Amino acid sequence: MYSLGDDQEAGFKARDSQNTPSLDRARLFAAGPVLAPKSVDEAKKLVDDNVAMNVDIIKIRVDDNLGTTAKMPPDIYKAVIDEAHRKGKRVAVHLFYLEDAKGVLDAGADFIAHSVRDKDVDDAFIAMMKRRNVCYCPTLMREVSTFVYESTPSWFSDPLFLKHVDPKTIEQLKEPARQEQMKNSKQAQRYKAGLEVANRNLKKLSDAGVPIAMGTDTGPPARFQGYFEQMELEMMVKAGLTSRQSLIASTRDAARCQKLDDQVGTLEPNKWADFVVLNADPLADISNIRKIDAVYVAGNKVDR
């Protein structure tokens, strides 16, 4: 699990204790606090603070939340990226708009942490991504979570989902007043439209050879870890990727994108034996990723 932001001390302790052959839980890599500096000087200081925490990557937000907040200006995000690179750290960027994506790439960003959702990507953006071999993490289920609770999702009756979710959370999300509020939310409907753009952009970028890393933005309330990852692969296939491409984006290429491919991502000698055993072929039907027989971490069977 690669957490892109606001990780607490316990997360770093978990990360620092995971390089052991006896590990029987998920691996964790962490970005620490998401940086939101107000000046160039503060940008440098916050980067230095995160580096002192020994974060795995630096995370920033370049987004105005659909026009409701101020966006980090280019001089400041460039200062973050430059300082991070001086200290040997890569930078992941939360964004929404195509022009911001181009701007952060110009500034040297290393990882695009969400889909471009305001418009279709163009040839110039694709060329920038490929020239620097920057990875793109679509987080399609993040968009789904912003509007789907305007009604009761079908998966609320899935036994696999219900096995691990807090029933109180389900009841809250099924409240008629809450669903009506989301249905009438202009922001939710904007993100719903953004999902269609995100789907097209994922397919276009994948076809062009841009490296894709599966991610979901799970963790916040109503973004269900584990289950949303399974749904993300299904969403990627619905967007036009093959089952094989979605699986590679979730394993080998995700590891490559985070510079972890010497440890995980494929089953090879001298790497950790982290893998899932399924009861059906996901290449034949991507929904077969739900048919889990066993999970192994470092070759150890995880108690499920």
Where are these regions (language model features)?
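Loop/turn elements at helix/coil->beta-strand transitions in domains of secreted/extracellular proteins
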Residues: 23-27, 53-57, 85-90, 108, ...
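Active-site neighborhoods of metal-dependent hydrolases
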Residues: 38, 45-68, 116-239
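Active-site gating/metal-coordination segments in enzymes
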Residues: 32-82, 103-106, 111
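Alpha-helix-loop-beta-strand connector modules within alpha/beta enzyme cores
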Residues: 16-34, 71-93, 129, 133-138
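Divalent metal-coordination and catalytic microenvironments
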Residues: 28, 54, 84, 94, ...
